Amino acid sequence: MRLSILLGLLPLAPRPPAVDAVEQRSEPAPLIEAQGEMIADKYIVKLKEGSALASLDAAMEKLSGKADHVYKNIFKGFAASLDEKMVEVLRAHPDVEYIEQDAIVNINAEQRNAPWGLARISSTSPGTSTYRYDDSAGQGTCVYVIDTGVEASHPEFEGRAQMVKTYYASSRDGNGHGTHCAGTIGSRTYGVAKKTQIFGVKVLNDQGSGQYSTIISGMDFVANDYRNRNCPNGVVASMSIGGGYSSSVNSAAANLQQSGVMVAVAAGNNNADARNYSPASESSICTVGATDRYDRRSSFSNYGSVLDIFAPGTDILSTWIGGSTRSISGTSMATPHVAGLAAYLMTLGRATASNACRYIAQTANQGDLSNISFGTVNLLAYNNYQG
């Protein structure tokens, strides 16, 4: 069944018998209620692998004013406003794998004061004040910051940052969160990988929130866009965002990782098991928890078996909008440490997109952290600089 035929059903709002023209299924496709703050009448429709998509462009024309997003890369599907009848028609269609209600996603940050994280990831013990690193510093890599945007004109980025996609009227970072994360990844003073290229993808509004359907579209964009960029040493996606569990978001993140992008995500700031949050609960990507300067799990950081690594996340000083700096806390701040470290290691030839998270875990400082719950890794990111 071609996607154009499938999506062509939507504008008609037919009663269930309208699917008689296509092959019937024995049971309707699952209808998943996303955890968290759901959005009324907004749905993400995931098609089965192997569904023919030759007429996707025609389908998009038929959905003019109906589809919010059409996904072509990380998985096949779309997001749209659907009433109950439309949902039931689509659930009966043999090409639909599942339908999930859209939900709100937020940044994972809190306000705080004081810098220290870079020194910690280049040392085997806490309390140091010097960041030690190889001067290659992530050169030849690209890091996508999927967030509130990036203030590319900030002097700390030295012309290495640019906005490449926005889902809002303005590409400007009116929040600061994305710029802060980008600074920890690759700014001149506060960055782990000081020579990487930074690409901003604005999926969250200036209040720091957005829809899962938009997050998925941002990942879909990255999966295609990076192939047209000059990133010979590797590509990373940093996502310091999260919300309640979502099958669609997890699937998108897993497929972005599989496409050749190292995906680092925030564990979340709920002091709870990260398996109940997305994209943190996706096992094939790199889920990052936060620590403080005393090597304690940050009081807010999520935990559990889905975490891969911890990194500094309390009182992290980095770039801010308006050409300034600010110190904030969250697993949002820990994640760019790991994203930057992945880019750094890729340039050195020690890691690739497929194995970077595993390599970081294998070479981490082990057993140094306190306030770690049973079943959670006791691993703190470390760059293993030997110079």
UniProtKB/Swiss-Prot annotation:
Binding site for Ca(2+) 2: 124, 368
UniProt-annotated catalytic positions: 147 (charge relay system), 177 (charge relay system), 332 (charge relay system)
Protein EC: 3.4.21.-
Keyword DNA damage: no
Signal peptide per UniProt: 1-21
Propeptide segment residues: 22-108
The Peptidase S8 domain, residue ranges: 115-387
Chain ranges of the Inhibitor I9 domain: 42-107
Binding of Ca(2+) 1, residues: 308
Cofactor: Ca(2+)
PROSITE patterns assigned to the protein according to its UniProt record, in alphabetical order: SUBTILASE, SUBTILASE_ASP, SUBTILASE_HIS, SUBTILASE_SER
Any one cellular-component term (Gene Ontology): extracellular region
Family: Belongs to the peptidase S8 family.
UniProt protein name: Proteinase R
Upper taxonomic lineage: Eukaryota, Fungi, Dikarya, Ascomycota, Pezizomycotina
Gene giving rise to this polypeptide: PROR
